Swiss-Prot record:
Domain comment as written in the entry: A Gly-cisPro motif from one monomer fits into the active site of the other monomer to allow specific chiral rejection of L-amino acids.
Reaction it catalyzes: glycyl-tRNA(Ala) + H2O = tRNA(Ala) + glycine + H(+); a D-aminoacyl-tRNA + H2O = a tRNA + a D-alpha-amino acid + H(+)
Cellular compartment(s): Cytoplasm
Gene: dtd
GO cellular component term, pick one: cytoplasm
Lineage: Bacteria, Bacillati, Cyanobacteriota, Cyanophyceae, Oscillatoriophycideae
Protein name (database record): D-aminoacyl-tRNA deacylase
């Protein structure tokens, strides 16, 4: 699984010019799913997103508070293109991403893990063409990756 995490002042996602998910201060997560992702990766990454200290504390000291500490909001958007491989040719190959049916199940599990936090969690529409508007704060953008361990 790959996640592009962005600290945001606000963010929203639209499908056919209708907003389907929007948040104020918090995190926008662009999530790519691989066919080997297991519950262990999902839980680890959900916990990492919830626990990372990316926000200032009430005194303004940077990197002191997590999304949970500030009771922020999270927008989760599926993005299979994170597994795009551009090493050959002029078109990316997406063979490293999970097939849509499998990816949707894994994505929904990941969202469910985040929802256990009690924070406001909004999502895009899985598999749809979406427009995402992000007001990046900082900017703070991180790439989180966790692949299944070989058996």
């Amino acid at each position: 699984m790959k996640i592009v995490l962005q600290r945001v002042q606000q963010s929203h996602v639209s499908v056919n010019q209708h907003i389907v998910g929007q948040i104020n201060q918090g995190l926008t997560l662009l999530v790519g799913i691989s066919p080997t992702d297991t519950d262990a990766e999902l839980q680890w990454l959900a916990r990492k997103c919830l626990d990372l200290r990316l926000f200032p504390d009430p005194e303004g000291n940077p990197w002191q508070a997590s999304i949970q500490d500030i009771q922020g909001e999270i927008l989760v958007v599926s993005q299979f293109t994170l597994y795009g491989d551009c090493r050959k040719g002029r078109r990316p190959s997406f063979s490293g991403s999970a097939k849509p049916d499998q990816a949707e199940q894994i994505y929904e599990k990941f969202v469910a893990f985040l929802r256990q936090s009690g924070l406001k969690i909004e999502t895009g529409q899985f598999g749809a063409m979406m427009q995402v508007e992000i007001s990046n704060d900082g900017p703070v953008t991180l790439l989180l990756e966790r692949e299944a361990k070989p058996a």
